[in-house]
Every structure is written in structure tokens, then in C-alpha cells.
């Protein structure tokens, strides 16, 4: 039995369909997931690399896999950890958007906000209406992110990347 296709099922449905499979997957990747979750403590992300065509991109995938871990926590009965993790994921995504370091980083941030907020809504739909939210949720949803601010920062960063990339290629052509 394989994993259900991501497009047709919610994260909770996918985890419920194969809880033991996900338990093993999460156990094998626990250290990487813990490191990714620890990044939520940082208030920004800036790439240390110059903007060029050959600039390496961070491995964003572990950040997106935290949604699966939080869904597994919920399915396994650890509601507090699941809710806290989803709210931390929303905040982490918002910070990536606000950093404006690169267009791809902002897009990953938007995906994190969407995935974590969707999971949070799915979990809350199954819980009593008076369910208390963890403290992480206050910061995650404290104030709306001005769309213009996030988009402007991302586009400025993309402009810097494109300009730097072209300059690096011109430098290579002139040197040859």
C-alpha cells in the first residue's frame, strides 16, 4: 500500500489512510524535521550568497514536510503539538514572505502559510468549538501581512537576483 496522492486528499486524510507508513517516515526523518521546526524561532531568512545564476537555493522541502508531521501528531492524539506546530508553520511562512530575500523563498512562505492554515482549519473542524489554541497561534495570526509589502520585497529581491545574474554572465563573457 502506497501513500495516497496528495492532490485528492487532505493531509489528515492521507495520514489516516496509512498511519504506520507515516510513523516510519517521520521517525526516519526526525532529526531533519526537528532542525526545520527549530527554524521557526528565527525572525527572518536572508541568503548569504550573492545574487547570480549559479546561486544555490536552500533545501526548503523539510519545511513543507512539517505539515505532515503535525497531521500525524493530530491523528495520533497529540492535539496540542499538532495545533502548535501548524501555527508555528504559519508564522514561519509569514516570515519567509516578509523577508523578501527571493521570489522562490516568498513562494515557499506562501505555500507554508496555505498548507499549515488549511491543516489547522481541518483540525479545528474536528475539535470542540471551545478548543483553546496554543500560544504560537497568537503570533501566527496577530496581524495580517500587508500583501503589497511581501510582494514588493519579493519582487525587489528577484530584481536584484536577475541583475546580479546578468552581471555575472557579462563578466564571464568579457573575461573569455
Kindly give the residue locations of the regions a language model identified:
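Short acidic linear motifs
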Residues: 1-176
Amino acid at each position: 500500500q502506497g501513500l495516497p496522492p496528495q492532490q485528492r486528499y487532505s493531509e489528515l486524510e492521507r495520514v489516516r489512510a496509512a498511519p504506520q507508513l507515516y510513523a516510519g517516515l517521520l521517525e526516519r526523518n526526525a532529526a531533519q524535521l526537528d532542525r526545520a521546526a527549530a527554524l521557526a524561532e528565527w525572525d527572518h531568512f536572508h541568503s548569504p550568497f550573492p545574487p547570480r545564476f549559479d546561486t544555490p537555493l536552500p533545501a526548503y522541502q523539510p519545511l513543507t514536510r512539517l505539515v505532515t508531521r503535525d497531521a500525524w501528531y493530530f491523528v495520533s492524539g497529540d492535539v496540542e503539538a499538532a495545533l502548535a506546530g501548524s501555527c508555528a508553520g504559519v508564522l514561519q511562512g509569514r516570515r519567509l514572505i516578509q523577508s523578501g530575500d527571493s521570489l522562490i523563498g516568498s513562494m515557499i512562505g506562501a505555500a507554508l502559510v496555505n498548507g499549515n492554515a488549511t491543516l489547522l482549519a481541518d483540525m479545528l473542524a474536528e475539535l470542540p468549538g471551545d478548543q483553546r489554541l496554543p500560544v504560537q497561534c497568537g503570533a501566527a495570526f496577530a496581524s495580517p501581512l500587508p500583501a503589497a509589502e511581501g510582494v514588493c520585497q519579493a519582487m525587489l529581491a528577484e530584481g536584484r537576483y536577475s541583475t546580479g545574474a546578468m552581471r555575472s554572465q557579462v563578466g564571464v563573457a568579457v573575461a573569455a
